[in-house]
């Protein structure tokens, strides 16, 4: 693609890279279509743009399509690009015929009378100009500061550019109002000495000196200073000195800088400092400054740009439509702030031109020059302008160009990363229990608007109306004639539903629209969990995918029935809840001695009839001959019976025939169906009644049991073939073999390279037979001739494939729909209701409370006697009341167990609503309440007792009613809960945004990176409590091994490069008791620009190996950020002590880790700097410290001792004789990450971060997979700071991606050159996006100006690797269906017609038919086609 710096209409997909560089004055003229010389906008009478003004139609394009801006003649579209010659004026001006959209792209310019320094280059990132120049005053050690340069730019100070041999005027000396008189005086005296022989010169110089002396002592001199310009003139007249101010001075300095020489000097200074044996902190600062300066200098050298490009000579005027003037009612106008800022520049520029022409006094001209500089500054970045920004009449800061870029409402985030979408609507949602899982109810009126173009086409095709206009009128008037056509049009056109906030990818899913009356969208009740929706007024947005590719993506990837598992932990996210659970629980309750118990029915239908007649109870256990049940039991003997409750027989009808029968809640054992069923099998001849009565009652199925059943169904019926595989069988189906396809399906190989299980082949065969008959029937109605065997074309094969494929992938969803229907039906039938009398209370409550009161009064008397401190008394009181509440809770648990049919307990036990904690407050005691306290960092550091709990508990329950004091006491906690939730939501959203920016570019890019770096995993254990946080079994499942896994005897259990599934993981851990496994990990992956399949392992949302093209980085960020709202902000108090433990849970600690804080909350841990053995722990007398002695071997294998001093009041984590490794804690507390990195190395930091982040989430009961946290951690440690560049092109002090670093070093070593040296550095999530290789991605995150400034001076190129930069350009993102995916993978969503290329519509395949007429008819059709 040709390189262009002009606005161009290029196909986005052809853009390969974008570069950003400084615009020269020639560039601006090339962009411009004319100079703006007047500050006017539009004429107040005619409302037409003024000529040469800010909205001039000749410069910026016409306000009306294809209309000449001069004579007003209208042209056709075909004349676009020509010029109008209608009038003599037109012939002179040559106006181009253009559409009005050109006003969004055509630019103008203002030719400034003086160059202006670009605001960003002396204000942003500590002034690029200042870093570049670093001016030294003469031969002294004094340097020109950043502020001095600013004073020059704003004409407050002057600078000596050339001393002309005058010693009193050293080069680069700054002359300001304070020191001017003395400097000029010394200079004039020296000048006098040099001009003793020139009488005229002496006279003028003496006169000037006398005048200077007069002014210095006078009031005028003190108030206004000296006249710089007059004195400069005299000095410049009689010497070759040069003193200047303003942008001209800066221009001179930038023109005369020798970049190569500067580069050489900086490098030698760096070498000098590095060669010193000891470097002090001030030297380190100098080094840091030199590195930064070197980067700026090398940026200019490498990009080949001139430093003077940082000055503005011609100021671009952005297109008129991007700074619009909007007409309001009443003849008033509202204008964009940018127009006001441009007007100020034009007015000042015109005035300056006038002063120059009139040869006005220098002071007046100088003032105008300063004002122009300030006006351009305000246009570029008004918010940073000092002393105060330009304001409007109502004292509001005007929005400049920088302000329009940054922030949530800026160009990047408002217009480029998020756009408004056509063909969309939104409405309130209501529940739609009658819908199938892949359906959504769309209001008719909404559908008529959303699908308008398709409806118009259909109406015209059916000759209901003849024109688009009349069709649109029918739709707008909602004419009843349109509804059948609306229903026809929406068939096979899915819609996307989105609920804000879109916290994870399941917040957008696709559904098939179903027309409904009313104005609310009907949502399927099972998908509410994924959307986090409820029906209390939530709204949802609907979008219509338009292109064929988008429709296929929606059906294959976004359909709700394809998103059963949640990506964060791989568990089903589509689980029945509330009413449905209550219904299923009620349906599966067993009651001994219920009506009709032990009855025998001949089959399920006769049992159902008896139930409907009321002769048998739903909860009675009855028997049915097992031969009559359509279930595969694999039991010997054929005359026995199966017994269960009527309800369970009904419940089991929801499952496929080849799914085991569910008898009880031991769901995990149904995989071994034979053993499981034996318990409920009565062999022929046994007494049925006795057997049933002697069998213990089973618990009903609760929420947890249902969850396990759904997981089992998913694992059993999830599609294991690709669409291409199914198409290969359907391609051979015809009228003779359509009933017998099971063998062909059974011969297919699954995606896991195993043989297809029989249940899959059987299901597919059944679907094929069913749909073949349907499609054939449909076709025979259309086809005359032989109606039984019509000729199939490619469309019929596609239809058959689509129907069979949909049924195959919908098996799990259809079972869930059945469960949902049963749940709703039987929760209604149960008639569950609760009353105040259903709340059962404990008889022991008063005794328990009395016990607490007695204990606390005893503590008070001990405190009064001085046996306890107040803090100890408080802590013991809190502990006692917690114990009392626990005892009352245990009493209530017994009551719940003894009354299983109480409606409240049914709700609790089933998991439909509420839990024990709620019931304790309802029927027992409310307990302790939170207090209004703030924990300070000093409290945590000094481990003070913080009284965050009111020590007098609320002794009443809600059933008793609270006293006035108790009610007041509980208000603080109740309000805190609500405010915390609100604050948490915002914080969690911001965290997700930061994480997405960190990981957005990480996509699965290749199969295998062949890395040798594994990651050893074992149980994550909380060392304090010795509890397992994440078991090893969970950590290794779904990961590849990097080496053979062996048992204790050295026998190989799992070979290298094997994906560990759930069974293997169980075998490794439970059977062979392996404690640690070396696996492939993202932390060791060497794939460029992403990760490889083997290092990532299993995709949790599909339970298969992750597909190439999967945007795992964004999934990871969403998985960590989405549950963020559930993380508490409250801190856990162990007996009220504000220690480190307070923050181990909750949001604060998570932010602290992810942002890599330098000083974590609480007192940090002390870690070992060496690998050794603890030989001694001493406590010196009269000291508050312990001395820990560690013996270790140094580099020469000599024994050394390291003494670590630790505070006495801290918990030691080591004892004498312990082995200790680098980075291990000596005392408790949070570890400082940078310290751990320095002593323990990157691997230790990775393990520590992983453990700590998992700890935070698991404490709240949230399961997140390791691999997502690994992605974020790998990004945090992905940069290397260069200390010595060797023979590479790296710049000292720069940050380089670790893979680039290692690859460059390998290349250098192969060539025998010196490699670069550097150290790994850790960055928090706030910093990482700013270090991105893509300037577009970085600038759209934060600090836009700084990123753009640094990118432009180095002429940086963005190769569009990540997701964000492609979205900004409007390109397809390099992930998913636009990635280099493999054939037959998740993203291989091609047009189904491609599977039937041999069945093209042009050639009909004559199927053998008996009917002669049909033969003739077909021959005729074939000859016609030929």
Swiss-Prot record:
How is the co-factor bound, per the entry? Binds 1 Mg(2+) ion per subunit.
EC number assigned by the record: 2.7.7.6
Cofactor (UniProt): Mg(2+); Zn(2+)
Question: Sorted alphabetically, which keywords does the UniProt record give?
Answer: DNA-directed RNA polymerase, Magnesium, Metal-binding, Nucleotidyltransferase, Transcription, Transferase, Zinc
Residues that bind Mg(2+): 534, 536, 538
Name a Pfam family for this protein: RNA_pol_Rpb1_4
Matching InterPro entries: DNA-dir_RpoC_beta_prime, DNA-dir_RpoC_beta_prime_bact, RNA_pol_asu, RNA_pol_N, RNA_pol_Rpb1_1, RNA_pol_Rpb1_3, RNA_pol_Rpb1_3_sf, RNA_pol_Rpb1_4
Which SUPFAM superfamilies does the record match to this protein? beta and beta-prime subunits of DNA dependent RNA-polymerase (SSF64484)
What top-level branch of life does the organism fall under? Bacteria
Entry keyword Transcription: yes
- State where Zn(2+) binds: 1009, 1085, 1092, 1095
GO BP terms, alphabetized: DNA-templated transcription
User: According to its UniProt record, which protein family does this protein belong to?
Assistant: Belongs to the RNA polymerase beta' chain family.
Q: What is this protein called?
A: DNA-directed RNA polymerase subunit beta'
Q: State the taxonomy lineage.
A: Bacteria, Bacillati, Mycoplasmatota, Mycoplasmoidales, Metamycoplasmataceae
